């Protein structure tokens, strides 16, 4: 047993290695940059691991798609602004059936926002960020060891579903340091293996050869250059059913705290850690697989409680999904501006349970003796 002080971002990288990842492409952006730095150092000492610091997030996203098509387990890491730029590539990977992993370490937005302050504003971007009709499988850990484990799950889910999978994190989880035994965790993990034919054997379709993942449809594959609704539907439902089946294997959540209380608090990521001192007063539902929504599981649990309160570091994105799942209104506590504290959680829950507004009072303008703090740069 080797217990070591480990950062959340480092745990993600080590989880990727445990899952068999051999390629990383990325562009530095706070608060995900440690993953890029660690990958760079690892590649320098392990030539079998390939590393690319690309010119931007668009290139990074497309690079991991190419690496995956060539047979590697590949991933990238970014934050909200970079993930916005990657959306076209995410959709392409979904369409072509490319297993790959995107890590989004969220910060306060929109746009540059506050690069060093935590936020959870990309919850719905993951679900509907790209064009088309699909929802990537997405995980959101709340600690270092869990970040390691869900990274392995993310790679396995990507391989099994042949689709991009997202790992969500935030500034606090990414920079959280905890003493954990990741070597012991790795022993209990099982990494999905990539099964490919021998490289170089040409298939019966022009311009295609075995040994890599390729989208063998369309005019480049010798098929008519016309749209066929029936064929599209066949491919779509084949991918959808595979996706649903795989997502069901990773229906991970936590239902705990005081399960006999009459109020259920729904929260995730770092907010669930901040709110933990309230465990004696409330029940907890914490989704770990954040997408697709754990609708059936949550609905069955929520029926046992008088009130459901959703606490999250955004303006109620997940609360919208919770209401759709349980078919009744919920109380909302939005933690905005990067301020995620036990006091804010406590005050917010008390306020909404007493019938008050979701939003706290707007802070006053700073006086001339208290200048406004700079927001920083990305």
What residue ranges belong to the model's regions?
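Short helix-loop-beta junction
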Residues: 40-45, 238, 276-285, 327-328
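Conformationally flexible catalytic loops at phosphate/diphosphate-handling active centers
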Residues: 45, 162-255
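Thiamine diphosphate
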Residues: 1-128, 135, 143, 346-348, ...
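Peripheral docking tails and interdomain loops at the edges
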Residues: 312-378
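Short gly/pro/ser/thr-enriched loop/turn and capping motifs at secondary-structure boundaries
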Residues: 33, 82-85, 107-112, 173-175, ...
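Generic long, charged, amphipathic alpha-helical segments
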Residues: 268-301
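Conserved anion/nucleotide-ligand pocket segment
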Residues: 139, 143-178
């Amino acid at each position: 047993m080797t217990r070591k002080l480990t950062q959340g971002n480092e745990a993600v990288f080590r989880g990727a290695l445990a899952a068999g990842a051999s390629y990383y492409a990325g562009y530095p952006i706070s608060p995900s940059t440690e993953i890029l730095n660690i990958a760079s150092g690892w590649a320098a000492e392990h030539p079998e691991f390939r590393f690319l610091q690309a010119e931007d997030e668009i290139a990074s996203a497309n690079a991991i798609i190419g690496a995956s098509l060539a047979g590697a387990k590949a991933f990238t890491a970014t934050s909200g602004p970079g993930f916005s730029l990657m959306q076209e590539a995410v959709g392409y990977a979904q369409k072509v059936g490319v297993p790959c992993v995107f890590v989004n370490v969220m910060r306060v937005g929109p746009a540059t926002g506050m690069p060093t302050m935590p936020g959870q504003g990309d919850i719905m971007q993951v679900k509907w960020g790209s064009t088309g009709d699909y929802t990537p499988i997405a995980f959101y850990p709340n600690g270092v060891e869990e970040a390691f484990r869900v990274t392995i799950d993310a790679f396995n889910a990507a391989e099994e579903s042949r689709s991009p999978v997202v790992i969500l994190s935030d500034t606090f989880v990414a920079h959280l340091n905890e003493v954990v035994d990741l070597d012991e965790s790795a022993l209990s993990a099982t990494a999905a293996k990539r099964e490919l034919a021998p490289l170089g054997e040409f298939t019966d379709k022009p311009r295609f050869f075995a040994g890599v993942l390729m989208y063998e449809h369309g005019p480049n594959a010798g098929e008519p250059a016309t749209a066929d609704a029936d064929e599209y539907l066949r491919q779509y439902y084949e991918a959808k059913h595979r996706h649903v089946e795989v997502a069901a294997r990773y229906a991970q959540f936590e239902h705990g705290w005081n399960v006999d209380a009459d109020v259920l608090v729904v929260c995730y990521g770092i907010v669930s850690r901040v709110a933990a001192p309230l465990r004696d007063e409330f029940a907890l539902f914490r989704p770990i697989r954040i997408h697709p929504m754990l609708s059936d599981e949550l609905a069955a649990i929520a029926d046992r409680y008088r009130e459901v309160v959703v606490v999250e570091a955004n303006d109620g994105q997940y609360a919208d999904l919770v209401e759709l799942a349980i078919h009744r209104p919920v109380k909302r506590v939005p933690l905005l501006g990067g301020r995620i504290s036990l006091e804010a959680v406590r005050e917010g829950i008390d306020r909404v349970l007493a019938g008050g507004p979701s939003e706290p009072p707007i802070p006053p303008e700073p006086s001339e003796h208290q200048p406004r703090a700079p927001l920083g740069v990305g």
